[in-house]
Amino acid sequence: MSLLSALSSRRARLCGLLIILLLLGAVAWQGFSAAPPSGASGSPARQSGAKPGRGMTQAIPVQAAAVRRAEQDSYLSGLGTVTASNTVTVRSRVDGQLMKLHFSEGEQVKAGDLLAEIDPRPFLIQLQQAQGALARDTALLDNARRDLARYQRLAKDNLVSRQELDTQASLVTQTQASLVSDRANVDNAQLQLDYSRIRAPGDGRAGLRQVDEGNYISSADTNGLVVLTQTHPIDVLFTLPEGDIPRLQQALQHQGTLVAEAWDRSDRQRLATGHLLSLDNQIDTATGTLKIKARFENQDDRLFPNQFVNLRLQVASQMPVLLIPAAAVQTGREGRFVWVVDAGNRVHKRSLSVGARDGESLVVLQGVDEGEKVVTDGIDRLTEDARVDIIAARRPGAAADQEDTQQP
């Protein structure tokens, strides 16, 4: 009996120990599962295992500006190319050796200015030959007329036949015809001599010379001597969508002529002010646009042929428009858009249509309302419905002033 009771007591102790171990294991498992994952911060959201949600993300600092209303002229705008009002390739009209160039590359020349000289000696010889033939035939005509007068007096006394009189009269007529031809030859020889001195056909700026002195040139040369481009005045050729044509025609009917402004490629600086010159007579079916030409005096030479500019046509004066900073407007696959800040300081992407640029602002045609706030800085971090913190723009030099005050 004592052996059996000992075995029972030992088995009971083992069972109790096993139960205790199981309880300790359960407690340890609960503690391990409740512990935060390795590397987690001590924020309440992460300790509870909750994922970041609405209202729990950190606000993104941005700068914003309100959409404002202003009185401004209304424009139609398009991309244009500056073109010379006249372009002339100066070519020689006669063949010969180029003796002298009288212009500098890039120089402004006037109509009639001497540009080049060709060796004149062959043309002088031709002129002298023509003048000699004219003098000879003039003398022959004078002699034939005197003979005709004598024949006429003798014919009255029947001392010469009628045939001889008619022959002498025909000789006078023939010599007169020779004189007409001789005078034409003299004029032609003089013209060829004049052509040996090449003059500017009109006002313009001389380009790079196409041939050097000493070369033999001819009237068949396609490159010519130099190209002259008239830049005073100068034109800008641009296009407008066919949807803008009704506004353009209405403005022409009311104003007669329209003010045109040429701006640089960045659309930040006005280069020149001119007027609408002409419209094409048909719409380009391939692009759905109408070609338009504007003219500028260009006395300061700020416009240059083949330069790309932004062209604006003023179609109305002092119209109420909405303006936003140009820095707020972004371009994506869906077109132009801005980030609009709502009353809860959350941002939303908004597509919009813009018009002409006015300095650092853009005219808004559609997409936002007056008073709405649009993000102007900090845009690269924004996503739809992100929470933002609008901060004031730092005054230029403020950081440097702050560092100076902190230095001992």
UniProtKB/Swiss-Prot annotation:
SUPFAM superfamilies: HlyD-like secretion proteins. It comes from the Bacteria. Keywords: Cell inner membrane, Cell membrane, Membrane, Signal, Transport. Residues 1-28 form the signal peptide. Residues 35-55 are annotated as: Disordered. It is found in: Cell inner membrane. One of its GO terms (cellular component) is plasma membrane. Gene3D superfamilies: 2.40.30.170, 2.40.420.20, 2.40.50.100, Helix hairpin bin. It holds the Pfam family HlyD_D23. One of its GO terms (molecular function) is efflux transmembrane transporter activity. InterPro entries: CusB_D23, Multidrug-R_MdtA, RND_pump_MFP. It is a peripheral membrane protein. Residues 35-50 have a biased composition (Low complexity). Its main location: membrane. Belongs to the membrane fusion protein (MFP) (TC 8.A.1) family. NCBIfam families: PRK11556.1 (NF008589), RND_mfp (TIGR01730). Part of a tripartite efflux system composed of MdtA, MdtB and MdtC. This is Multidrug resistance protein MdtA. The lineage of its organism: Bacteria, Pseudomonadati, Pseudomonadota, Gammaproteobacteria, Enterobacterales.
